[in-house]
């Protein structure tokens, strides 16, 4: 075949194939166009997904940093959504009214009833305790969390004993919670628990005041506004506290007191409606507060003094009092027992107090105990938590429209505090080492009405007996202020009281 023939043949083949090639190009173009449309749609979907994801992330971030406000149990609380930061506002007022049913007062020279040593105003008040009313507590504060692991609490109090005060710090502390062993470190001003009765909040206590033995031990190295650093731990059936404490804020001294407060509790038996609590506690004063400068050759006095009021503080007079004891230290040891069965509970504590006195005089020791029981008539049990029994919550808060009356609770207590050491017999002068602080016995019958979770009323009857001998000399002041040695300066009387409390 010549080249001409080949050229003609190839041209003919192209001519016959051209329509097929054109059709193939059209199909390819259609597929490309379809792919481009799909790609465009996919790009649009991706853009929408990006925007939606960005919006969701923004919403999550906004929710994480958003704050919530609640009024659970009447307490205003502000919190971040993750709970890392919270602020709860607290408030409480306790208005106490009391009538002291005493024998009529006589002249100072013939009526020997007395109060604290060396206090002329208490000499007068002991013979005529003041009926009336006072705000035992009027507190406002804030507590909460910060950065998840930190807790804080600040509480200011305008109440007082006998008369209201201008205001003082009741609590001001910060606490860190370790991620293991439920261990917490607290530093600031607070009252480390020194016993079973001390550990319960006054907002939920069975009576308007703690039993005198418990309150006396509390005042040694604990109490509201006490500077301290403490380790606190606990599990399902135990708690433990160890604290180093100093002075109470606002207490003036030279060298401050240094002391240790420790407590350990255990629940050996527990069921849904019953439990048994046991515990031990101690308060040890290593260095009592100095009463003056420590001059070479004439060291400062470091006094320890134990005294208390008759478990009500409308009148602030103390009827038992050891006076100042110049001491190197003090050790108090306490044993606790509590039990609960449904809406009935009992608790008791015993305390032994040993004072390490300076000089050649023998070391005095004192003791006290109490037993109390509570029965909720309406059936609600007291709430046991962290080594203490807190107030019941009314199942049916007071509401006249619904015919509900809140929770009602009966309380019974007997307490004994003995601040005598080698007191001797009536009509005799004391020996050199004697301390005639007095022995106080109180029987209390109470009725509590829990209107709702924030309001309650407490009515009580107390039978008080104080047995105390005069040490003579000028213990209560010069002249007629101090009865003859061995004279009875105690008394028996009754108290009728009512507390109105609003707490959130």
What is each of the regions a protein language model found here?
Residues 69-70, 222-223, 328-329:
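A short catalytic or substrate-binding loop motif that flags glycine-/basic-rich loops and adjacent residues
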Residues 68, 77, 230, 336, ...:
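Short, surface-exposed charged micro-motifs
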